[in-house]
Amino acid sequence: MTDFFGYGSLVNLQTHQYLNPRPTKIKGWKRKWVSSNIHDIAILSVSPCDLTILQGMRASTKNIGWKALDLRETGYIRHSLDNYNMQMYIGDPEYIDHKIKKPILLSYLDCVIQGYYKHFGKQGVKRFFKSTENWDHPILDDRNAPQYPRATILSKFEFNLVDEHLERL
């Protein structure tokens, strides 16, 4: 099994060079913000939910391998999605702090939303915000000095798209 399912920054193809990327959906998982003790910020993770269909990106590790992706996804563990013949990363419970709400880096969210907009359009962005839980984490505006290591350059329209959805929360 060499394919993975990305539901956050891996949806944005500017952040990686894995093979054969294509938009896809999986059923039975919901996305949520969790506090990471490794990164000292909020990260996206998933948990089981029979009612949810999650949009994301499927790609193959054949060209770079799992080791490089495992390193990128430090603080996550791989989980097999046997019904889909692929794997995805889930926030490692050992490194998640449920007692505190660490901040969501705006540069991270911008990167994620840029990917969703490019591959799923405005409706995909809307679904991302609606299908993601734990928006009660503070937002850290680091756009002028991005802390996210794979921050991307957004258009004014994309910045506004993120800001408009945050205002509606």
Q: Where are the regions a protein language model picked out?
A:
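A glycine-rich, hydrophobic/aromatic-adjacent loop/helix-cap motif
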Residues: 2-169
